[in-house]
């Protein structure tokens, strides 16, 4: 990586979350900005829940901030700050990226779902026809559910401790993806051949599994949105059973090009 040069004309991008130490975006996007010839940097912002709204207003009011990435747990809370939403963000009610427009307004969109699907396809996985159990119906989970349904999975069982949230997502999917069988579940079905953790479980070293999974058939595809230097509990479980897997790092890589295009309007 070349030496980072910052001056008064440097444009700023920030990633906002709680916690923030786990994120890989600042290093990656500083490199991508430099490769694109942009005088821009991305910085991490650790924002506590009670200060999130104020922080967003302050950041979006700064004239030299051109974009924001939003990570856990704020993807849903960030959506109302956008002047307009892209198609995916409108569908799921959450954003993971915001871009300042020339007139000072802000556009928000969600790339987690597309990033997860692209990450899986890059590894040669075929998603069509899969019977999916999905842990988590928050911003990332909603986006992944939409993209998996669009990719042609046969069924999707949504597992979330907030039943109302899971039911709301299921209802949206039944309308937008009528060919996919959608249900709200409390556990992984025995006929599931794809399991995805789209919850925050696995971010801490002390975390266990997002739910009861049990023994896995080696043909089961396992995914996790948690970006970690080491394998998360669910990915370790998959490896022990000889299952192929899509990690949070795969999802992160899968959406980096789309996010750069979003920020640069390429």
Residue ranges and their predicted role:
Residues 3-123, 231:
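Phosphate/diphosphate ligand-binding glycine-rich loop within oxidoreductases
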Residues 17, 110, 120, 125-153, ...:
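Glycine-rich adenosine-cofactor-binding loop
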Residues 6-7, 127-128, 152, 212-220:
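Short, conserved loop/helix-junction motifs that constitute active-site signature segments
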Residues 118, 227-228, 243-266:
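Active-site capping/gating segments
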Residues 153-176:
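NAD(P)-binding Rossmann-fold cofactor-contacting core
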Residues 70-77, 140, 200-203, 228, ...:
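Short glycine-rich anion-binding loops that position phosphate/pyrophosphate groups of nucleotides
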Residues 177-245:
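Rossmann-like adenosine-cofactor binding region
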Residues 150-155, 240-244:
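Conserved S-adenosyl-L-methionine
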